Amino acid sequence: MSQLTAEELDSQKCASEGLTSVLTSITMKFNFLFITTVILLSYCFTWLAIRALWKNNIFSNSTRLILIACLLNSVVHQTTMLESRMRQTYRSFVFASEPCNLLYRSSDCVFELHSYYLTGYFSTYSVCSLAFDRLVSHYKSKFYHTHQYFIAVSLLVLQLLLTLVSFYIAYYGVHLAGYVPVCIHYPRLAVHYSTVNTVRTVVMVCCLVVTGFIYYLSVKSEKQIQKSSYSPGKRYTAYENVTTSQSVCILIVLKLFCNMLSSIGINLLLLMGEVVSEGTFVLVALFLPGVTYANLCLPLVIYFKTKLIIRNRKFRIAVMTSMYGDAGEHIDRLKKSWE
């Protein structure tokens, strides 16, 4: 799609025949039902995940605070997506035969633009907070455990700053000219939109590498502690570092996959330019809301990982008590086996 001036975009009030066909199609209505289902599921599991973090927390307090902030942010993002899609679907029924009333003027979508993209960027950069949280936990363990809330708040502030900088680069000063099929559609004159998407993907890859390395070190450290230390506190801390790092790795992998699905897909469509019609671009783009999918994956991982770890803990305790009696006797047996 070629770059047009603001005046040319403002003159295109009516949807083209192809775009009208797409916006009123059965495929678009199926897309609405599919995305709505994803969002409603994310609401349910977000509630379950917050309850798990509050009542059966398996993470450090720092990690838990970051995850709760991400879950609350996801609710705002999903609600913005749902509201925009409901309005678009309503218009597709009411104005199906009036192409000049199908589209939204970009300047009328300021609230959705800010809400959708700010929460989307905040969700993406949560991987930075989680990665640095694991980094500090491993290399500055004593400081980490005595200043967890300070670390979490500091990382969330950094996450917010990255969000604001990305939004500033992508949209500050961009003229909200022309008309868009959905209010969450990026402004047509936002020339740095794809660049910011690429940077977000690179940042996520770097954070995945860092977290994967920390996970490897945590596993290695736990094995050494299990062999050399009899302190329940040290063993427990090492085990918690491994499980937390593993969970964060899973979260980042899923977020990266969802983000790449969206950013790479959109960037490819932008690069193809005139080869892709406006209707096809809109249809494909609405099937690729990566952050929306990631906002479902986040509570799913938290909830089911919590259930799994609690079950494993109960199983280990049952095995230890049934095989060796009390803890003191078990430690004596371990000492003899390690001599």
UniProtKB/Swiss-Prot annotation:
Short name of any one Pfam family annotated for the protein: 7TM_GPCR_Sra
Keyword Acyltransferase carried by entry: no
Predominant subcellular localization, coarse grouping: membrane
GO biological process, one term: sensory perception of chemical stimulus
Compartment list: Membrane
GO cellular component: membrane
Transmembrane portions of the chain: 30-50, 150-170, 199-219, 250-270, 282-302
Keywords of this entry: Membrane, Transmembrane, Transmembrane helix
Superkingdom of origin: Eukaryota
UniProt keyword annotation of Cell inner membrane present: no
InterPro entries hit by this protein: 7TM_GPCR_serpentine_rcpt_Sra (IPR000344)
Lipid bilayer topology: Multi-pass membrane protein
Gene Ontology molecular functions: G protein-coupled receptor activity
Sequence similarity: Belongs to the nematode receptor-like protein sra family.
Protein name: Serpentine receptor class alpha-21
Species the sequence originates in: Caenorhabditis elegans
Lineage, broadest ranks: Eukaryota, Metazoa, Ecdysozoa, Nematoda, Chromadorea
